[in-house]
């Protein structure tokens, strides 16, 4: 499980 919940778009 990574820390990135919302990838930068």
UniProtKB/Swiss-Prot annotation:
Q: Give TM segment ranges.
A: none
Which InterPro entries does the annotation name?
Answer: Periviscerokinin (IPR013231)
Keywords from the UniProt entry: Amidation, Neuropeptide, Pyrrolidone carboxylic acid, Secreted
**Can the keyword Secreted be found in this entry's annotation?**
yes
Modification Valine amide, positions? 9
For this entry, list what GO says about its biological process: neuropeptide signaling pathway
Q: Which residues carry this modification: Pyrrolidone carboxylic acid?
A: 1
Q: In terms of one coarse class, where is the protein primarily found?
A: secreted
Where is the protein situated, by its record's location annotation? Secreted
Tell me yes or no: is Signal among this UniProt entry's keywords: no
Recorded GO cellular component terms are: extracellular region
Report the family membership.
Answer: Belongs to the periviscerokinin family.
The protein depicted here goes by the name Periviscerokinin-1
Origin organism of this chain? Answer: Chroicoptera sp. (strain Kasungu)
């Amino acid at each position: 499980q990574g820390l990135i919940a919302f990838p930068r778009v």
